[in-house]
A protein has these predicted regions:
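Residue-level hotspots at or immediately adjacent to binding/recognition sites across diverse folds
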Residues: 1-307
Length: 307
């Protein structure tokens, strides 16, 4: 299952201008098929950012809804084998402009979604903090992030759960000078803890976008780090004790490249995907494969070498 957004003309949602609606496509084994998704009443725009499936009849997709009142809300949809259905989330007075970016499920009754929320510290001060939600098969509940008391802004963009009680989430933390650095939290049992990440040497800016955990003691996260005005792919590996930065390949001729997603079916078999630019501003897709020893570029349609 793949999710995202699709721009639609003005009549959709009753809006006066073009906007986004959720996009859901399913691979049947031979082709991609479009599926109909639903949104809450009063929606102006909506998009999906992450999806995970515990079985062929149990999938969860998460994203963001913009209401006609101008307020953003998180969007969660469930696939029961026949249709996508919206599940309403609990409201929180302390949470403004929330967004969900990714979700991980270990069973139909155990899913965790991550993103960010904005909360007010006073009349003129607000901060961005991690948003973590837990699904128990009946309803969503808020889980406190380990970083809620930190005055530095943090958000989570990717999550992987190698077991029901253990999840790793990655994202970024804004520093005092305005730059960002890799940020990660781990759920071990019932509580979340901040993990010490690895900062790439010689860079003022870096973020992690996604993570995959092929085992309890092995996780790989991807993102980017800044090199002058350009971006370079960032790959970090966790061995159960700490995070380390590992060499990441860039496409030949790339002036800027970023890895945005990763999936692993074994500790020695992972595939990461992202985008790159060369001399023109046009973006191309690219992918890289991990064989247990090194990362190598994998040619793909519409990617490396394509116009």
């Amino acid at each position: 299952v793949a999710v995202g957004r699709q721009e639609v003309p003005a009549p959709y949602f009753g809006a006066k201008s073009a906007g986004d609606r959720p996009l859901v496509e399913v691979w049947t084994g031979s082709e991609w098929q479009l599926q109909r998704s639903t949104v809450p009443d009063g929606t102006a725009e909506a998009q999906l950012a992450g999806v995970d499936c515990a079985s062929s009849s149990a999938c969860v997709a998460v994203g963001t809804v913009a209401g006609r009142s101008g307020k953003d809300r998180v969007l969660t949809q469930f696939w029961d084998g026949s249709a996508w259905k919206v599940v309403v989330l609990p409201r929180s007075r302390s949470t403004e402009d929330p967004a969900l970016y990714d979700v991980a499920c270990t069973s139909p009754t155990a899913c965790t979604a991550v993103g960010h929320r904005t909360y007010e510290l006073g009349e003129f001060l607000s901060l961005i903090a991690p948003l973590i939600l837990r699904w128990d098969g009946h309803e969503w509940s808020f889980e406190p992030s380990a970083n809620n008391g930190n005055l530095r802004e943090t958000e989570l963009g990717g999550i992987a759960c190698p077991s029901t009680q253990r999840c790793i989430a990655v994202g970024s933390e804004r520093q005092a000078d305005g730059t960002k650095s890799p940020f990660a939290e781990v759920r071990d049992g019932a509580s979340w803890y901040v993990m010490r990440t690895s900062d790439p040497k010689g860079t003022p800016d870096a973020e992690l976008y996604d993570v995959a955990c092929p085992s309890l003691q092995r996780c790989i996260a991807v993102g980017f780090y800044a090199k002058g005005p350009d971006a370079r792919p960032l790959i970090q590996s966790w061995d159960g004790a700490g995070w380390t930065t590992v060499p990441a390949p860039s496409p030949p001729g790339a002036s800027s490249s970023v890895l945005t997603t990763i999936a692993c079916d074994a500790p020695d078999h992972c595939l990461a995907g992202g985008i790159y630019r060369s001399t023109s501003p046009t973006e191309h897709a690219y992918s890289a494969r991990w064989d247990g020893t090194t990362w190598t570029i994998v040619p793909m349609p519409g990617g490396i070498g394509s116009a």
